[in-house]
Structure formats: C-alpha cells, structure tokens
C-alpha cells in the first residue's frame, strides 16, 4: 500500500502549491486546493501503477463537506479524515493495520512526527520531495522516449508483431 499525506505533499512542494488558488471571501463554495489535489491524484496514480495500492489521505477539517465519503479517482483511493480527526492519525492507523496484516506499506510525508510513528518493519518512508522528484523524473523520461520514437520512421512491417 502507498499512503500519501495529501496536504503535506501539497504544502511541501512547489509543484502542487503553485496550483492552489487564493481563498475567496466572496465564495464559500470555492475549493482553493481542487487543482492541486487533481494533479496530485494523477501523479500518484502514475507513480503507483502496478506497484502499489495507492491512498491519498487529506485532513477533512475545514473542507466544504467535513463528512466526505471515501472516493476513488484514477485508481487512487481518496480519504478525508472525519471532523475532529487528523489525516496524521488516519495514516498512522492505516499503516499500523497494514503492517499488522503482514503487508508492506510506503508512507509519503515530510511530517517528522508521522514518519517516526509509522517507523517499523515493513514500512518504507519517503519525503514529499522524493515523490515529486520521482514524478518529475518519470515525466522527463517519458518525454525523451516519446521524442526518440517520433524521430524514427516506421513502416507497416515495423508495426506488425513477429507472430503475425
């Protein structure tokens, strides 16, 4: 399982923080973190693909709907903590349950208290910056691969599988 401390990653890295809007006093239903969360979901989905069961945990306090149900987007489970509960405690609880069940867990957060709490056998800890570095490296590698492919000419025979 991959557990991501959502707002910690957003606040700790310019990649996502730059996507956050200023809160608007004229609109109570404006969500300043919508774009940042959407990009984070896409990045986590790409990072986790085929390797992890990804979960992003957000603090529910202060959200427009503090009783949000668990959601899923692009194969990533989104969990908002309940009113009065922190995302940190949700992450700690999920990591403890996974570890007790003998499953490996990777926790992404730059919160040192969370990192210390989830430390133990079967738990890998990565900083928020490490996730962003991995995502940006993957994007760069994909761009290079795409550019390399676009420079070569392909014939119909090149596109056919040898078994055909």
Predicted regions and their residues:
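Nuclease catalytic cores that cleave nucleic-acid phosphodiester bonds
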Residues: 2-4, 8-164
